[in-house]
Amino acid sequence: MIRIPLIFTLVLFVGCANNEYRFERIDGPQATTLPLKLDGFHGTRDGASVNAEARFTDGADSLTMNIALYLVPPPEFRSGTYEGTIGGKMIKGQVDCPSIMFFGGQSDQPSVGGVFLLKDEQNRSVYRIRIPATPMSRR
């Protein structure tokens, strides 16, 4: 009898494990977590269009990611770019988003989250950012 609640708890824990923020450098099949923290998520909504900016910082390292969403069921990621400095190196490129979340209506404070892949000049994914649904403040 005690096994059923234990199994349920384990399944619940595993199912919620990916709901944490993480900024990773992709090194081939390996990913290395970097200490950059989400410093702010700002944006505007105009009808079905959302433009947002996320800022990440850690000491001298900083990165800004700009994304555009279109709110149809389900929400669509339209485009994104990033630029910043990591490890003393200037970086910039395109953003891809295989998974996006958007919650909130016209009058509610919207929340945005998802998995964002930052690409280099050769269109290779070099960074992955996992963001749980995070309230977006107005610019």
Report each predicted region and the residues it spans.
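C-terminal motif of bacterial Sec signal peptides marking the signal peptidase cleavage site
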Residues: 12-15
